[in-house]
Amino acid sequence: MAVTTAQVCEWADYIDQEFVFADFPPGSTVLDIGFGTGEQMRRIGARGCRSVGLEIDPGLARKGRMAGLSVCRAQAERLPFRTASMDGVVCKVVIPYTDEEKAVSEIARVLRPGGTARVSYHGSGYFLRYLLADWDWRRRVYGLRTMLNTFFYALTGSRLSGFLGDTLYQSERRLRRYYAGHGLEIVEARPSAGFAGAPVFIYHVLRRT
């Protein structure tokens, strides 16, 4: 999943600049879920690791191959890798656009015991900022429908139909429940600066038990 320079600038006050996604020991095999432009894969490679990228967008997957990166096109909910085949996983704000528990379970499945995942999510503050502080009515509607979709999902376990249900924000409570159910433990938790008292981003370092 590609992030534009404009998006980085827009959210700069909330991004945890000290959280290093590429922090894995040399020699590790690391999966980057939603590798986007490949920037993170190159950082992982520069640390002496073998990086493998996964991307659902066909154009980004093609560009990654043309750039010489080891990539495949697939969904986060169906990782085409063997169980316990990865030393590390990077997943940078991909989960909000997936079946979140299934994606978390797949991260746990491909990690070897003792392997680590470095993951970030959208918290509720991300969409509250869209809803309450954005001048563009379309983005305010996007914030509102994501908030409503997540409330509905938390109550029923199902999303709203169609485009209304395409995005969820994550909560610490739901994430901790998924982790407990799929053999992951939190090594480090770093909520970002908040908006209206709610975290905009959530950063977790996880270990496979």
Where are these regions (language model features)?
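A short glycine-rich, Lys/Arg-flanked "PGG" loop and its adjoining helix->strand segment in the class I
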Residues: E101-P113
